[in-house]
């Protein structure tokens, strides 16, 4: 997958893109991520990339000229709505569609993305219109700029690109847990300050471990994100009768509570 990131602050991305999973994926040639400094395309002698908005208002607005020239330099042609842009351009914007796992899966299936990071009070609307940009938000809160949001987008999308994660991790991402919150996890030692790891996880019975994880995920999702739980129930079928039995118990129970040793009904 090819990803171009346009920003006024490319240095913010160095640690995120250079290490861990994203760094290894680039070394393997699975991801091709390039950073471009929008300021390099400013025609102002001081590399100015912003100005006051027409009609007044607080703050500064990113200029159209550097953004247009920057996009065209990396091969993006515009002309929307009459002409479809040559590349999919995403503008990280608080007024955009809120990013969710469904949209992440869709974006992960694409081979070419351009991500524009706004700053100050945003960008000239003509940039959005001419290049047919998709506006995406990562939540209902305010950030200083689009760089952090772009990092979230790149990381979440890259994880679903084949080969970026190990086979085991990739399979888990597309398993029955997709759409549910993650189950609790433990590592050594088995007992720490009087707190023990649930016995089922150390017993070696892989089927029981699988069912325990599923039940924990269901319980956490129903308790903390009932919206996700409802969506999961409507769109996902239990893979076998054992999972179905657990799911039906949660559908028929008003409230469940998570315990370290397992799941218990609060009404008991």
List each model region and its residues.
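Short, solvent-exposed amphipathic alpha-helical segments in soluble enzyme
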Residues: 20-24, 105-109, 130-131
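Structured adenosyl-cofactor binding patch, chiefly the S-adenosyl-L-methionine
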Residues: 123, 127-174
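Short glycine-enriched loops at secondary-structure junctions
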Residues: 38-41, 119-123
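N-terminal nucleotide/polyanion-binding subdomain common to many enzyme families
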Residues: 1-81, 207-230
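SAM-dependent methyltransferases
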Residues: 189-268
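Hydrophobic/aromatic beta-strand patches that form the interior of the parallel beta-sheet core
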Residues: 4-6, 34-36, 88-90, 113-114, ...
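S-adenosyl-L-methionine/SAH cofactor-binding core of RNA-modifying enzymes
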Residues: 63-119, 162
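Internal, active-site/partner-interface "lid" segment
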Residues: 148, 160-200
